[in-house]
Swiss-Prot record:
This is Uncharacterized mitochondrial carrier C1682.09c. The keyword Membrane applies. The keyword DNA-binding does not apply. Its main location: mitochondrion. The chain crosses the membrane at residues 16-36, 70-86, 121-141, 178-198, 215-235, 275-295. One of its GO terms (biological process) is mitochondrial guanine nucleotide transmembrane transport. It comes from the Eukaryota. InterPro entries: Mito_GTP/GDP_Carrier, Mitochondrial_sb/sol_carrier, Mt_carrier_dom_sf. It is found in: Mitochondrion inner membrane. Gene3D superfamilies: Mitochondrial carrier domain.
């Protein structure tokens, strides 16, 4: 059977520009929120008072004036900018490339296995999962960003190039856990978004969604993604925020979490993450889906 051709396929330039713009807008609004979320996930033990919460969030600036507290939430901004923009370009412009490939070569298989509507949505989800696994090549930037946010002492006065030279492949520590987190997380993100467009809004061409439709379907995808990936995300974050000279394996962290903190520790930071990372992901996903068609029309 001949492959189904995609209509109104956006240019790759529009995908890159739209994704980069979404990443820049996201970073400018949500970097402090991301810092708070990472620090809460990295905290061991229970928070029992507002004073303790203040210390966990603001670290050394806990007793500082308000302005200094605010600026303390912007550590590693350079790493964050580089990582976030590259990651959004890769994720939001890369998924359509994989989706186009699957559509041209395996669309009939998806439709036959899952049905026409579900097959299309699962194809989008599968493309997202494949791209999500590939994100591990960005791990060094992610590691540097998280360490700067949660464990700045790990830098010990070294610059980024010195760290890259010293640590080499150690910066990919936890790559397996990252891939294990990204595969279902990205599947749920793009799958939830696609299913909402397919069955709630009855869209035949997902790129024709309105801003409201993109916003609503992004909420569905982002919520599913964060819940599905939460346990592995906690492990990944703890692997990455350890000192360079005192690493711990994911299985050691897993064992200690079960032994000392209990099963609920795997969902530490989930509520603030849904309230903080959730809007961030919804915002960037909505903007990418809206800006890519916009730039495609603008550049034609």
């Amino acid at each position: 059977m001949a492959p189904v051709q995609l209509k109104n396929k956006e240019s790759q330039t529009a995908r890159i520009v739209g994704s980069a713009s979404a990443g820049i807008l996201e970073l400018s609004l949500f970097h402090p929120v991301d810092t708070i979320s990472k620090r809460l996930m990295s905290n061991h033990g229970k928070i029992t008072s507002l004073t303790q919460l203040n210390t966990v969030i603001f670290r050394d600036a806990a007793s500082a004036p308000l302005l200094q507290k605010a600026t303390s939430l912007f550590p590693g901004l350079g790493y964050a900018a580089c990582y976030k923009i590259v990651q959004r370009i890769y994720k939001y412009s890369g998924q359509p490339i994989v989706k186009d490939f699957l559509n041209e070569n395996y669309r009939h298989t998806f439709d036959k296995t899952f049905g026409k509507g579900s097959g299309k949505a699962i194809m989008h989800a599968t493309a997202g999962s494949i791209v999500g696994i590939g994100e591990i090549f960005l791990l060094p930037l992610d590691v540097l960003k998280i360490k700067r946010q949660t464990n700045p002492a790990a830098f010990k006065g070294r610059g980024v190039f010195r760290i890259l030279a010293d640590e080499k492949f150690a910066l990919y520590r936890g790559w397996g856990w990252t891939a294990a987190r990204n595969a279902p997380g990205s599947f749920a993100l793009f799958g939830g978004n696609a299913f909402a467009k397919e069955y709630i809004f009855k869209l035949k061409d997902y790129s024709q969604a309105t801003f409201f439709q993109n916003f609503f379907t992004s909420i569905a995808g982002a919520s599913a993604s964060l819940i599905v990936s939460a346990p592995l995300d906690v492990i990944k974050t703890r692997i990455q925020n350890k000192n360079f000279d005192n690493p711990q394996s994911g299985f050691t962290i897993l064992k200690n979490m079960l032994k000392f903190e209990g099963p609920t520790s795997f969902f530490k930071g989930l509520t603030p993450k849904l309230l903080t990372t959730g809007p961030k992901l919804v915002f960037s996903f909505t903007m990418a889906q809206t800006l890519i068609p916009f730039f495609d029309k603008l550049l034609k």
